[in-house]
Amino acid sequence: FHGYTYSGIPVSVAAALAVQDIFEKEDIFNRAKELAPYFQEGLFSLKDIDVVDNIRGYGMMGGIDIKTDGRPGKAGLATFKHCYDAGVNFKATGDCLIIAPQFICEKKHIDEIIDKLRTGITNYQKNQKN
């Protein structure tokens, strides 16, 4: 047998099978599919913030581009810090905020994410004016 150090480890295989069982029993993918339009609606509600340049999304994933001041990455990092201080964590790449809520979330969690994103992005915007 030839494989990799991470191939065929019984504990890992058992864990993966258990996760698949949970996804099937709790209908995780269909729950996420049903929540996706609600998440997208919340995400696109942020387009009224002046520093938001572009919003795009698909399913339970979204990207928010922050307008730059000519220095790539600076606006994205600063916005990320304001959002983190507001209580939401995500990936920021360059000037794009990448949002992907967990599949197990509920509407109340999406509301919280969007509220904290709004707070963080708005705080960044206010800081830019000072």
Positions of predicted regions on the chain:
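Conserved N-terminal phosphate-binding loop of PLP-dependent enzymes in the Aspartate aminotransferase
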Residues: 1-130
